[in-house]
């Protein structure tokens, strides 16, 4: 086995050109070990004194037990090596084996040569040859074989392998003479005592021929030591064959070889090639032939070689560190590291000169740091004092593969620090992550952590839910057991009373044979036909059961004529049921459902005791158990049905939200859209923009300005990007990469790179949500200050908006609170967790604050102790203005004193309008400066002066539909503020109006079974109101009977529907008595003339309204003006088709099937109803006639339209998104 002694660097420190002649050393052919590893070193200067200046070697020996190997070694250019003439082998014990395998060796010589040719470098090898005759011999003769042809030439680096001193069995003959004072290249003399051949590599020396310096002296010493060690007798026990077949030296020989290596290392520590050598090349082992057995002691040999290598590496490291320590000490630098080039996923040793640090008087020195600007993997460890010259302390730190720099400070473990004069210490990691890659890595780590936390939270919730389910199931089981026990007791009481009346037999009317029987016995039951009301019956049947008809009619038998002659006796055979205590029966003239005459013992039925029945106690235990099982099964079925319905509802909600988001993104497709539509974090997205539909129409250039996360992303706004023309018409496009931590993409467009005219969506900017990001949008805090809230204090639509909008925004992961007066007429049964919160004083009045949950929303109830809200009503007091003004001021004071700092304060209509100016005048500079005011107009008919003042002070203002906002834009209180005035359509509460879970309709339904559900609802409505049960078109009208609602158009539509053979149902009442009486007269007229096709219900009925929405084919809403309108939205939720006048919110939500296809497409919708323009009879006829004709002539198309409108989302999902955009726009304002 070859035991290499590798060098990590050149043994000589420098290579200086000499004037003397240099030898070019050529490889020895034929005897080079096939496992030789090449090493690049400098050419050696040949000194006249013949001393070896540097040696790299290994010792190997092949004993007679090894087969010979034919090795082909690559030759260098030049003359052939001299000497080494093959010799005949001497007698040896393994000669026959060698000869036998000679043929095999010949066939393997080619592969062995290839192995030697792996290195492209020139190799030099020296060999010590031993024979079997004398393995203990000592090398005594040294011959240097010179290559005269290569004497002249300049100094050049040559490539050679680590030189070996090897022992190998060879067949050769001695050639040449002995010269023990000089060793010549390419010649060798076999020592007769040992048979060793020595090949030495001559290292290049610095200086001229006559110059003698420390390096040359060291080289001379190495040569001397080599010579001395080769004079030592090698004992057999000092040799051990390794798994490569070579011999490893042990004992004095190995020790002296190690000393030579160390001496060489000390003399050449300044080599420039220390870091460039590939140490792995020194440790390649000889290949082992497949049929060559492994020698014993292989493990020990390998460990010894490894130990030698590690020891040499440690020496090299120590010497390099000592050099760095000396250099930094001389320069007064207190910090260095080794290795000097720090790489990722490796260890680095950090050295601190405590004497030059602020810690020079401290006994403990610690390092505290982290990687990548203190953002990754912090560490703290103690430094230890070193042996280096100077007060050097050190520690090792592992550099993670994600690092691009390390940052650290030193301290004494308490309060004394060395932080590089406040700048901290840092080390750059070469080849580490780029900063942007590390940012993405951190984001991915954060995402994984979030996923982990989410899974853990989900598991905790699952376990908690499972525990709740188990506890609830236990409670339900106990409840079922109690109920079973109670029902069994009731049955027991009844049966005992019946058993008292029951008899064993009655000879005159009936009897049983045999008289003694038990359960499951077959008996004959005889009946005397002549004794009762069936004396004239042609046939006789028994209808029977047991135990007070426990299982209903379980015995049905036809009786036959008996042979008994003392009466008209008939009989039948009956099997006594199991568990029967007594039998119950009646006689009839026919089977069930066909019998006419009965004999039921004068309405008491017949009863007969089973004489040998089971013990009663046992029966009642079993009965109670059966009742319990029945209750359990019924409960299981109920819960399964309920679970299925809940899951279906949740699925529908999710699908509806997804459709709404898609329609939200497509609603601006005529201006801008993206590919893909759903933007994913970490991917690229292309933005398409159509300037033809914007203020940038006709501009020669369009520039795209983009950022993320509401313009707050860490990367800041991206550089402006010039958009390029797209393939589709007037669109232009730009592509950007979406960061991993993006949750929103924000952009605007401009005509020039430096600005000019902007399209920023009227100050709102364009925003598109990003999905799959590691960052989530931080929640906003919105506070509604209102005087109405459904369902606890609802008067009109304002209360619905406050509750429904708040729930929708809260569902989008924002924080919502509501401040409401504590009326004495609140519906407290809808308030959960109601409790006292605090009290405070304002305006000389104590105000108590209560807290509760309403529809899942946090509500603070303000109760001033001056009695302003103890009037038994919401509106209707003479001092309503004073009451609500006080409430608005008190609400702002509550926010201030309570430490609230909401992002948005949202006030509604005239009643909470004072919040806007009170905030700006008294609170914006006193702790609530962060907040922005949003004001919503629900009804412009009341408090116009208050609304105008609120418009002036609000940051953003809205009304309940875009069209209505245009219709009122000319109003004097609105016109000056159009720049901040927006229309957002209201929504409906999908939980209140839900045909799948509506308890007021006969069959729950969705869009999948809309025809079945609406058919059943129509039939139920017709039955309830006494209308004709016929398949006719039914028009429903649900409204307040006021002139705003178009009562003259309503009357005309009723007559038109009846003329078209339809049915009409109206539900509503009039606040004006004259109008109410007018409709009472109309109802009387219609009920007398069209009693089976018209019904006017002139008082509001909530359950009936649900049934009308579900059972009607059409819902008519002919309003003269309508700010938003919820009736048409509710109608579509139930699959009814709206017929409306084009005004306000009706125009924004209903798209005519014949005229509004393009307008609907721009909103991401499909046409969904019939509409008309005028406010006269002709307009109503135009829409209503088309609707009725569609029902009559195209029923399949009409049914598909019902399904289509049911799938449209008219909840608060979309309005909530619009309000959030408005809130964000308000927050941007200074």
Curated annotation (Swiss-Prot):
Q: What are the Polar residues biased-composition ranges?
A: 152-170
Pathway recorded for this protein: Glycan biosynthesis; starch biosynthesis
Tissue specificity, per the record, is: Tuber, sink and source leaves.
* Binding residue positions for ADP-alpha-D-glucose: 794
Q: Where is this region: Disordered?
A: 66-189
Asked if the record carries the keyword Chloroplast, the reply is: yes
Report the protein's function: May account for most of the soluble starch synthase activity in the tubers. Contributes only a tiny percentage of the granule-bound activity, but may also contribute to the deposition of transient starch in chloroplasts of leaves.
The name on file for this protein is Soluble starch synthase 3, chloroplastic/amyloplastic
